[in-house]
């Protein structure tokens, strides 16, 4: 090797080492920034940390990998934890129960329980009549249990409780390692009504919904918003009502349940012949309910879904679709509003329709998304690398017309925006495609 060749060789090695060193330093810096993001003590601090990450111009795939792994959870308190419920009309505390053998390196299912008799006037009803905090068996649970507290000023069928339960779930996500695809909602009596309400308002987090001795029909009189049967089509529900129920007469509940069974292939219903308005039947069905839970993890990215709302600000999103703007177009009427039940041989309106709503019906095949709309002027498709092939063009067809076609470029800012909202390692988004309906 000549001296010139030798110098060239060592120069090449030097440049290679500098490049590798810079790559390693960039990776270390990104890991530090993401760690700062996870350790932020408030939403504002986390937003600031997210902006720092964006300014660092990281490689998208590296940031995506770090967010999909998530934070390193510290050792936390186990047992019974009181969590404040914010809000003017809410009872002061909810209860969260953490398994006694909780290990922060394992992810745990979550079960949210909505108690009955929510029209009571006691802000401490949860402690006095529903939850025995001295019951040691509760600590042997293999799931993280969340017990929100409701009363007459904040029943389950109002926005204040929908927001409260979202914040409680966010608190648990922030402090404990959960399996985001195994977050289950259960309610008894009034809590069963609440299950129907919450699933209809925001279904994104739930894997399974189990209303026991509740009433979907009652929401026609109780709900502070419109209820849409279409929103249950993709739900995994295990419903139990009783034949001798003296509060929710099965004769009037059955037509609504029959409608759910006809539109949702993932809904199961058990009618207990011998019971009144009680849970005496539960031991006999416990194993069946648990099997149902185990068989129905949440799918963050279903290839077919439907969503309907009259309020795009509070309830416009379902998983990877979001209704942005409502309005009527003469040809914008291709999707159907499921809103009839057969009552005593006659078809009647299931739920009132006093406010205009919008509906999206979405089906996806490979990278082609077909959308039918009713009463929608604009919507958004959220694109995840776990759902779409970002190396190939994405095509969106709205009401039979092409709305978008092209390569979707992953964006760090969008990734962080939706992670800030969801804090969900199993549902990350790389891009938004906004579509105006013509």
Identify the role of each PLM range:
Residues 27-48, 262-267, 273-438:
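Alpha/beta-hydrolase-fold serine-hydrolase catalytic core, especially in secreted/extracellular enzymes
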Residues 100-106, 155-190, 200-206:
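Gly/Ser-rich "nucleophile elbow"/oxyanion-hole loop immediately N-terminal to the catalytic nucleophile
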Residues 108-173:
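Active-site machinery of serine-nucleophile hydrolases
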Residues 181-231:
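Primarily recognizes the serine-hydrolase "nucleophile elbow" in alpha/beta-hydrolase
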Residues 215-290:
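The feature captures the conserved acid-bearing segment of alpha/beta-hydrolase catalytic domains
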């Amino acid at each position: 090797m000549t001296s010139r060749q030798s110098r060239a060789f060592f120069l090449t090695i030097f440049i290679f080492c500098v490049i590798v060193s810079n790559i390693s330093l960039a990776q270390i810096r990104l890991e530090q920034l993401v760690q700062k993001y996870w350790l932020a003590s408030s939403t504002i601090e986390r937003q600031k940390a997210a902006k720092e990450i964006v300014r660092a111009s990281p490689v998208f795939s590296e940031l995506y990998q770090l967010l999909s792994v998530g934070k390193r959870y510290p050792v936390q308190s186990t047992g019974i934890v009181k969590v404040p419920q914010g809000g003017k009309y809410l009872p002061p505390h909810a209860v969260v129960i953490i398994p006694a053998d909780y290990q922060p390196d394992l992810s745990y299912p979550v079960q949210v329980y909505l108690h009955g008799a929510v029209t009571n006037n006691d802000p401490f009803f949860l402690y006095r009549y529903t939850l025995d905090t001295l019951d040691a068996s509760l600590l042997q649970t293999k799931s993280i249990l969340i017990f929100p507290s409701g009363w007459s000023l904040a029943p389950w069928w109002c926005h204040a409780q929908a927001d409260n339960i979202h914040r409680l779930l966010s608190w648990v996500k922030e402090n404990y390692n959960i399996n985001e695809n195994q977050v289950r909602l259960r309610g008894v009596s009034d809590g069963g009504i609440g299950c129907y309400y919450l699933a209809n308002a925001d279904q994104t987090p739930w894997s399974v919904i189990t209303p026991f001795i509740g009433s979907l029909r009652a929401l026609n009189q109780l709900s502070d918003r419109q209820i849409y049967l279409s929103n249950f089509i993709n739900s995994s529900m295990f419903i139990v009502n009783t034949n001798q129920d003296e509060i929710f007469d099965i004769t009037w509940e059955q037509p609504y349940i029959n409608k759910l069974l006809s539109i949702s292939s993932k809904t199961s219903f058990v009618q207990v012949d011998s019971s009144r308005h009680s849970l005496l039947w539960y031991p006999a069905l416990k194993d069946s309910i648990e099997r149902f839970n185990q068989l129905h993890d949440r799918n963050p990215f279903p290839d077919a879904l439907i969503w309907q709302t009259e309020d795009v600000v509070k309830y416009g999103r379902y998983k990877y679709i979001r209704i942005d703007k409502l309005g009527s177009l003469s040809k914008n009427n291709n999707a159907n509003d499921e809103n009839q039940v057969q009552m005593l041989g006659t078809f009647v309106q299931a739920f009132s329709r006093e406010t205009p709503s919008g509906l999206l019906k979405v089906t996806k095949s490979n990278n082609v998304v077909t959308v039918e709309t009713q009463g929608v002027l604009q919507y958004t498709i959220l694109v995840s690398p776990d759902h779409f092939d970002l190396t190939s063009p994405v095509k969106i067809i709205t009401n039979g017309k092409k709305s978008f076609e092209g390569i979707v470029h992953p964006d760090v800012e969008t990734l962080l925006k939706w992670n800030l909202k969801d804090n969900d390692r199993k549902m990350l988004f790389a891009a938004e495609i906004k579509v105006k309906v013509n």
